[in-house]
């Protein structure tokens, strides 16, 4: 399969730079997987699309203020983007500089350059950085870090982004990008879903900066997926198996929930799904046999991204590309702060030929 098979024309004006004033009032494009039929509506329509006993699986990761500015003590400006927190003192990060720092280099971080750190080692494209500070890493990041808005949101971060670029149920700090499908859920909608008898479970996948890396190969089978840490605890496994046993559906909220659940299913030895705690490099593209999920809530993704490939594997390639074409024609808002889709599984996607 060629990466270019997953391209589509997107006017710059459809890229959302700010979220809707009310989270759950965004637009919702529903795609019926088996038929390809499209329905236009509002995100709160989700309430009518789910049945009592269905299980929504959310990702409860919390975005950290992962972008730091500063300079090398020897001179030269740097920009640091945290990939993950290693412990209370160390981070693994991308560093943008005119000349990459060498191990042992002293870094002065923060807008006022008040935080001292040392680049201790290099691991491929990533740098290990240790803070010379009594405070734990997370406290330092909260004090001096900027919210890591995606590169296509072409504006500086604002104070409001510290809450707007978080899901209302975010709990475990560690992501450098929000699981954006979850941004549309507000407390009234969650309460209404519970009232209807919709079950809820929470996985954790700390989204890494690799999620924004372009696919740099021509053939998607040659792509090497970035690694991210995921947790699927026993209570999620129990909820999934119970929902399946009673004939209800598993609805993943976002591609990160998909990747967490499917990673846990891939690693399972004796059951459909078992607890999973570890790094995952799962790459889902057409031809992948989904094991757990029956429906998906997701935003609109970048052309030629691994995420539009994941959606195509679920809904079918032609159905997905047709839906995206319709979304552009109907002026849906795209990407992290944009509108959403509700998609049901297309069993024919597994054997569909990909290509235009």
Curated annotation (Swiss-Prot):
It is found in: Cytoplasm. Keywords: Cytoplasm, Queuosine biosynthesis, S-adenosyl-L-methionine, Transferase. Gene3D superfamilies: QueA-like (3.40.1780.10). Pathway: tRNA modification; tRNA-queuosine biosynthesis. It is an enzyme of class 2 (transferase). Its EC number is 2.4.99.17. It catalyses: 7-aminomethyl-7-carbaguanosine(34) in tRNA + S-adenosyl-L-methionine = epoxyqueuosine(34) in tRNA + adenine + L-methionine + 2 H(+). One of its GO terms (biological process) is tRNA wobble guanine modification. The keyword S-adenosyl-L-methionine applies. GO terms for cellular component: cytoplasm. Signal peptide: none annotated. GO terms for molecular function: S-adenosylmethionine:tRNA ribosyltransferase-isomerase activity. Monomer. Belongs to the QueA family. Transfers and isomerizes the ribose moiety from AdoMet to the 7-aminomethyl group of 7-deazaguanine (preQ1-tRNA) to give epoxyqueuosine (oQ-tRNA). This is S-adenosylmethionine:tRNA ribosyltransferase-isomerase.
């Amino acid at each position: 399969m060629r990466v270019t098979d997953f391209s589509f024309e997107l006017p710059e004006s459809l890229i959302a730079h700010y979220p809707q004033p009310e989270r759950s009032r965004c637009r919702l494009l529903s795609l019926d997987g088996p038929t390809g039929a499209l329905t236009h509506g509002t995100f709160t329509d989700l309430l009518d699309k789910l049945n009592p006993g269905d299980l929504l699986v959310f990702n409860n990761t919390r975005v950290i203020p992962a972008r730091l500015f500063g300079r090398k003590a020897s001179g030269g400006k740097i920009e640091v983007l945290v990939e993950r927190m290693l412990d209370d003192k160390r981070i693994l990060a991308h560093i943008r500089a005119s000349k990459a720092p060498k191990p042992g280099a002293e870094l002065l971080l923060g807008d006022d350059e008040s935080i001292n750190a040392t680049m201790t080692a290099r691991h491929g494209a990533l740098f290990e950085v240790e803070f010379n500070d009594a405070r734990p890493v997370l406290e330092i990041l909260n004090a001096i870090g900027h919210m890591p808005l995606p590169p296509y949101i072409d504006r500086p971060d604002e104070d409001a982004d510290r809450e707007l670029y978080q899901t209302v149920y975010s709990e475990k700090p560690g992501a450098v990008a929000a699981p954006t499908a979850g941004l549309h859920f507000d407390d009234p909608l969650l309460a209404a879903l519970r009232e209807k008898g919709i079950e809820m479970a929470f996985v954790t996948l700390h989204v890494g900066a690799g999620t924004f890396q372009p696919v740099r190969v021509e053939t998607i089978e040659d792509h090497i997926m970035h690694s991210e840490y995921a947790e699927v605890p026993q209570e999620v496994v129990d909820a999934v198996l119970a929902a399946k046993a009673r004939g209800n559906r598993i609805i993943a909220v976002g591609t990160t929930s998909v990747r967490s659940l499917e990673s846990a299913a891939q690693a399972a030895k004796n059951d459909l799904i078992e607890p999973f705690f570890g790094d995952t490099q799962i790459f889902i593209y057409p031809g992948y046999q989904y094991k757990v999920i029956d429906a998906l809530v997701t935003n609109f993704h970048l052309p030629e991204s691994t995420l539009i490939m994941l959606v195509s594997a679920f809904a079918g390639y032609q159905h997905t590309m047709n839906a995206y074409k319709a979304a552009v024609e109907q002026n849906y808002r795209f990407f992290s702060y944009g509108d959403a889709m509700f998609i049901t599984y297309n069993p024919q996607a597994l054997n569909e030929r990909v290509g235009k």
